[in-house]
Amino acid sequence: MLYHETFDVIVVGGGHAGTEAALASARTGQKTLLLTHNIDTLGQMSCNPAIGGIGKGHLVKEVDAMGGLMAQAIDHAGIQFRTLNASKGPAVRATRAQADRALYKAYVRDFLENAPNLTLFQQAVDDLIVEQDQVRGVITQMGLKFHAKAVVLTVGTFLGGKIHIGLQSSSGGRAGDPPSIALADRLRELPFRVDRLKTGTPPRIDARSVDFSVLEAQHGDNPTPVFSFMGDRTHHPRQIPCFITHTNEQTHEVIRNNLDRSPMYAGIIEGIGPRYCPSIEDKVMRFADKNSHQIFIEPEGLTTHELYPNGISTSLPFDVQVQIVRSMKGFENAHIVRPGYAIEYDFFDPRDLKQTYETKFIQGLFFAGQINGTTGYEEAAAQGLMAGLNASLFSQEKEGWSPRRDQAYMGVLIDDLSTMGTKEPYRMFTSRAEHRLLLREDNADLRLTEKARELGLVDDARWARFNQKIDNMEQERQRLKSTWMNPASTGIEELNQLLKSPMNREASGEDLLRRPEMTYEQLTSLAAFAPALDDLEAAEQVEIQVKYEGYIKRQQDEIEKSLRHEHTKLPADLDYSDVKGLSNEVVLKLNTAKPETLGIASRISGITPAAISILLVHLKKIGMLKVGEENA
């Protein structure tokens, strides 16, 4: 049976990738359908109740700068906000928020239900309609066919999902949800490279059974940070603390004594788990010299008693989970509400993707989220936004777009995935970016909002606020440049008290702000340089741009040099064995990867600068390079 409407873009899956993909496509004016197996789970936080963190918060800010939903949702659902690395430089500062799961999910659903150009439909997808290597639509479990010009798959851990608790296993996409078996089988028929990954979640605890009097409280920041560039502290619900406890030698003894009942150590689980979020049994065995691990006790919301013990993800049997939990301080009488478990699922080698998230083998088919081997809500949201945008552009027969590595962490993400692939769940860190001084949380809008507006992702309200911020910054910098003080000026004594060494020559406000000991707040407290900007975001930008001007200029110069051949196209049908001078190893890697540009080719492991030079000569020879460009 054929559905009575045709769509421009279909998004399959309503998690963090799917919601951003559907909204991005709809925001650009394309008729979009979001298919989910259960509308009640739209925007559900399947694992930890938190958004942000090192590297991850940067992605959330970038998604927000391009009109995405995640930052606004957490601003309305966050019950504790903190700035991580607050004492360090601006490049590595990151925002993190605990979420009320129910508030977060409700905000996402409300936003989706009221989004123009977006239709929701509850049905699991079992098959793709593919004709002559181009996707034409999907077929649902009940046999209903939907046609579209582009399809985005954001299926999370549902493809061939298998849940493990001890030596028992069952099929499932997550606890309480069925897996997607038919679609997994269908995708395995297509020419994609497929493998298995694993992730896990800890048992949930009833807060009424915990003795908080012996636990260390961890409070959020005051004033609370805000995630969205459109956000406000008044959007935040009531703020509450988290708590800290620790495992101990008794905990570790319980784990060691029961490893034979662990599906990981019994060889039942074959998928590789996340390196930076290991299970408690993995931590105990890998770090045998440590007799204690810190566990963060995170409330799941304002209207529930459930607690999320961050740090004891496990797939050990339930009776062992009870022993582990009750061995920890404050948890001696703890009641487990939901058992922890591990889940194995299919993922597809992201080297089979273009930089637009379109698959190389099926035109119009896009992948986003855990299907690409990533882990984390934030990584999923970033991929979803870009895949939804590019599916929209594809449906309009327009050229796709993806940010470069020097423009966004979203660019680092797709570049890493599509050039290097991954053998384990990929997580974003600031250390993955070569130009992280330019890719700060605070300037995500300055980097991306103008381009997002051009692409149709940014509405008038966000655009107006962005332009007001730019105006405020420019006017304030001009004011500080043109305001001077000299050793004879009124107020010099007050100024000198703020300086390490007294001022001995005339200086502008910008000159003084460049001094390491001087802050914008201190400078504008002086009568000569008052008043300070009311726009705190613009004020922060003024201070960072002035203080780090030299370093920023140096990184920009480095980027300019490295971009000479970044976008030089490589023919899709080029047989690299025809290129004289390339080694057999390089030929094999290039023929396998089929990189779209020289820049992408240069980042494939084993591709040397000499090989890139040979490719430049070959491109000139076949007329795809302008004379002199190979020496540019």
UniProtKB/Swiss-Prot annotation:
Q: How does it assemble?
A: Homodimer. Heterotetramer of two MnmE and two MnmG subunits.
GO MF entry, a single one: flavin adenine dinucleotide binding
Does the record carry Cytoplasm as a key word?
Answer: yes
Q: What is its main location?
A: cytoplasm
UniProt family annotation: Belongs to the MnmG family.
Q: Does the keyword Flavoprotein apply?
A: yes
Please state where this protein is localized: Cytoplasm
Q: Which PROSITE patterns match?
A: GIDA_1, GIDA_2
Alphabetical list of Gene3D superfamilies matching this protein: FAD/NAD(P)-binding domain, GidA associated domain, C-terminal subdomain, tRNA uridine 5-carboxymethylaminomethyl modification enzyme MnmG/GidA
Record's protein name: tRNA uridine 5-carboxymethylaminomethyl modification enzyme MnmG
Keywords, in A-Z order: Cytoplasm, FAD, Flavoprotein, NAD, tRNA processing
Cross-referenced PANTHER family? GLUCOSE INHIBITED DIVISION PROTEIN A (PTHR11806), PROTEIN MTO1 HOMOLOG, MITOCHONDRIAL (PTHR11806:SF0)
Residues involved in NAD(+) binding: 273-287
Offer a single GO CC term for the protein: cytosol
Cite the SMART domains for this sequence.
GIDA_assoc_3
In this chain, FAD is annotated as bound at 13-18, 125, 180, 370
Q: Which domain of life is it from?
A: Bacteria
